[in-house]
Design a protein with these regions (language model features):
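Hydrophobic alpha-helical positions that pack around
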Residues: 134-261, 279
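Gly-rich Lys/Arg/Thr-decorated short loops/hinges at beta-loop-alpha junctions or inter-strand turns
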Residues: 25-31, 83-95, 199-204, 246-251
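Conserved phosphate/anionic-ligand binding catalytic regions in large, soluble enzymes, centered on
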Residues: 30, 51-71, 113, 171-183, ...
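Cofactor-/ligand-binding subdomain signature composed of acidic, glycine-rich
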Residues: 1-46
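Short acidic, glycine/serine/threonine-rich loops at helix termini
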Residues: 60-68, 92-95, 134-139, 175-187, ...
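Ferredoxin-type iron-sulfur electron-transfer modules in oxidoreductases and energy-metabolism complexes
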Residues: 32-48, 77-79, 85, 94-99, ...
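Short amphipathic, charge-patterned alpha-helical segments
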Residues: 109-113, 260-279
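Histidine-anchored nucleotide/phosphate-binding helix
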Residues: 102-116
Length: 432
């Protein structure tokens, strides 16, 4: 029976002698979720996922049960399972830990998906910089295959033939977008597709395809092993289970933690078992949630906020990838955003003009503020550019560029207006 504050995804870490050894994995409930899954009907498996209310852990927070049910009813005799392990989000390192320290949990989740959808092939698209982790994961795949959990007639079930292949990325952030990732697997340029159609209908090689994040796949065996209701009760009504969070920035205890959804944000930031408060002794100023594309929140306004999907959404924030970057009051938010904008300008794939040119113009404008060279017209120009890029970009990268900028503008307008006001004053007075 699961208990609140009991780790589910990090429970084996530090206990197993070898992260890739199947026998060690099985000592700690490994493959119990798969064994229960094959004892259930397809509808019972889907019902457990619906009850668990696991939201996708890659950032979009789409209910996993709905996604799996969509694929289950999709037309097509060939279906593919794809794990998105292209973890390129700055400030996010949770998938890296799961892949290196408990790879068999991810493999088990992918096998359960393969069983449910009668898939023959699964792919894990792993960040190119994770060369060492790719070797570890390949060793885990080989061991699982040798133990009879991959290959032909898995667990003695006639016709249950399924295997997983590692695909290495080449360091492009845009390939974290699911359709761009599938294009890359197919050997094409990693650029997003036009939607619809949904990937569950027309995905890899134009066949129905399931794409889930590493943490999402690792959570599936827990749901099947413990039951959807038990998983739901570990979180909140709007999002079950626990969430891996990555604490970084001006915070004392930087690192990876597993928290129950619904944990007070103040406890995460200041509690000694988690963040431990400011590392510099200065007051904490703002938090960047969910990766570079996530919104920014002021610490002072979040004292009563819970770390849950519904509560963060109510504050115009988001869980996103689980990244939590904390900055103290020595940081000017414009200085911080210049680095965020530079990241987006560099990683834009260039397919659509609004993102290709818009991210560059946003960086140029923020750099003007940063150099104290902005004029009174630059602030409305920046706001207009943010709106255009959001509305006209073809994929989620361009559509989310404005989130940190707009939230920072709303919270700290004085830090953007200072240089513009200085310009007006200097002009009206004829110089200093």
């Amino acid at each position: 029976m699961l208990k609140r504050n009991q780790p589910m995804l990090l429970e084996r870490m530090g206990k197993m002698q070898s992260a890739t050894d199947v026998a060690e994995y099985c000592k700690y409930d490994g493959f119990d979720g798969l064994k229960r899954a094959i004892s259930l009907s397809d509808e019972e498996i889907l019902n457990e996922l619906d009850v668990a209310h696991l939201r996708g852990r890659g950032g979009a927070a789409y209910p996993l049960g709905k996604k799996w049910r969509h694929l289950y009813h999709a037309k097509g005799t060939t279906k593919y399972i794809v794990c998105n392990a292209d973890e390129g989000e700055p400030g996010t390192f949770k998938d890296k830990v799961l892949l290196s320290e408990d790879p068999l949990s991810v493999i088990e989740g992918m096998i359960i998906a393969g069983y449910l959808f009668s898939a023959k092939a699964g792919y894990i698209y792993m960040r190119g910089e994770y060369r060492r982790i790719q070797k570890t994961f390949q060793e885990a795949l080989d061991n699982a295959r040798q133990a009879g959990f991959l290959g032909e007639n898995i667990l003695g079930i006639e016709g249950f033939n399924y295997d997983i292949t590692i695909i290495s990325g080449a360091g492009a952030y845009i390939c974290g977008e699911n359709s761009a990732l599938l294009n890359s697997i197919e050997g094409k340029t990693g650029r997003p597709r036009v939607k619809p159609p949904h990937l569950a209908d027309v995905g890899l090689y134009l066949q129905p395809t399931l794409v889930n994040n590493v943490e999402s796949f690792a959570s599936v065996p827990v749901i099947l092993r413990e039951g959807g209701q038990a998983f739901l009760e570990m979180g909140t009504a709007d999002g079950g289970g626990t969430k891996l969070i990555c604490l970084s920035g001006h915070i004392k205890n930087r690192g990876l933690y597993e928290v129950n959804l619904g944990t007070p944000l103040e406890e995460i930031i200041y509690g000694e078992q988690y963040g431990g408060g400011s590392a510099t002794g200065r007051s904490l100023k703002f938090i960047h949630f969910g990766g570079q594309s996530g919104p920014i929140g002021a610490v002072a306004t979040l004292r009563d906020c819970l770390y849950s999907y519904e509560d963060l959404w109510a504050h115009d924030l988001s869980v996103g990838s689980g990244a939590i970057v904390v900055m103290d009051d020595s940081v000017n938010v414009v200085d911080y955003l210049v680095h965020v904008a530079a990241f987006f300008a560099h990683e834009s794939c260039g397919k659509c003009t609004p993102c290709r040119l818009g991210t560059t113009r946003i960086l140029e404008l923020l750099s003007k503020f940063n150099r104290n060279e902005a004029t009174a017209s630059d602030l409305p120009r920046l706001e207009k550019m943010l709106t255009h890029v959001t509305r006209l970009s073809a994929c989620g990268l361009g559509q989310s560029v404005a989130k940190p900028m707009k939230s920072a503008l709303a919270l700290f307008p004085e830090e953007f207006e200072t240089t513009a006001e200085t310009e007006i004053y200097a002009t009206s007075k004829g110089g200093w």
